[in-house]
Amino acid sequence: MQSILKPITNLFTMIFQAIHGFVASLDIFGVGAGYVITIFLLTLLVRLILLPLNIKQTRSQQKMQEIQPEIAKLQKKYKNNPEKAQQEMMKLYKENNVNPMSGCLPLLIQMPILFALYYVFTGLTELQGVSFLWLGDLWAPDRTFILPILSAATTYLSSLLMTKFTQSQAGGAPGGMNMNTMNIVMAGMMGVMSIQFPSMLVLYWVIGNLIQMVQTYFIVVLPSKKRAKEKEQYKDIK
């Protein structure tokens, strides 16, 4: 795994060191705070790079939720012919320009970045013993379990915010329970993994989730509220 991710690891090592060099040159932060600000800026950079992909994923998820009632009808209509049901669903996806796998793409891209950063941070031995707030060693896992809990909580809330508003736009489309279960499982996995990860890596994930929630608010929540308000105004006119 490490050899496969070596090019990405080397790239992020250079980016991290360049950002930290700039932050350190300002000479206004303590050592620990300087590293945390560096990880914030690195996370912000990664999220900005992934923003077009996240927008595309969000639109695809919204379309998927909108056609869920039609998918349910097809599944019911062809319940004794799964092959025909699959063909009709693929036709429906094509007609609505929906890729059912697009929702997995951002995660598939983020996971190699996450593991590459794991190798970046474990290789930065100068982080050993550097503290910040309750974290006694940014290079080591958080033994207070505060960061793992934050990792699980922000992962779940970030996913919940997205699914809540994409489903509400589709009028509470079916499959919400399955999505919620997936959100819980994903959050649980990240919480468990965060117990063993260096604190700096978990900080990257938590900060990334918080930035994702801000993005979701502006990309999904605000437009959703605006459309709901327009619908209410249209009903009042009628």
Swiss-Prot record:
Source domain of life: Bacteria
UniProt-listed Pfam families: 60KD_IMP (PF02096)
Listed GO MF terms: membrane insertase activity
UniProt keyword terms in alphabetical order: Cell membrane, Chaperone, Membrane, Protein transport, Transmembrane, Transmembrane helix, Transport
Membrane topology value: Multi-pass membrane protein
GO biological process: protein insertion into membrane; protein transport
GO cellular component terms attached to this protein's record: plasma membrane
Entry's transmembrane regions: 4-24, 26-46, 104-124, 145-165, 175-195, 201-221
Quaternary state and interactors: Interacts with the Sec translocase complex via SecD. Specifically interacts with transmembrane segments of nascent integral membrane proteins during membrane integration.
Functional description taken from the UniProt entry: Required for the insertion and/or proper folding and/or complex formation of integral membrane proteins into the membrane. Involved in integration of membrane proteins that insert both dependently and independently of the Sec translocase complex, as well as at least some lipoproteins. Aids folding of multispanning membrane proteins.
Entry protein name: Membrane protein insertase YidC
Upper lineage: Bacteria, Bacillati, Bacillota, Clostridia, Eubacteriales
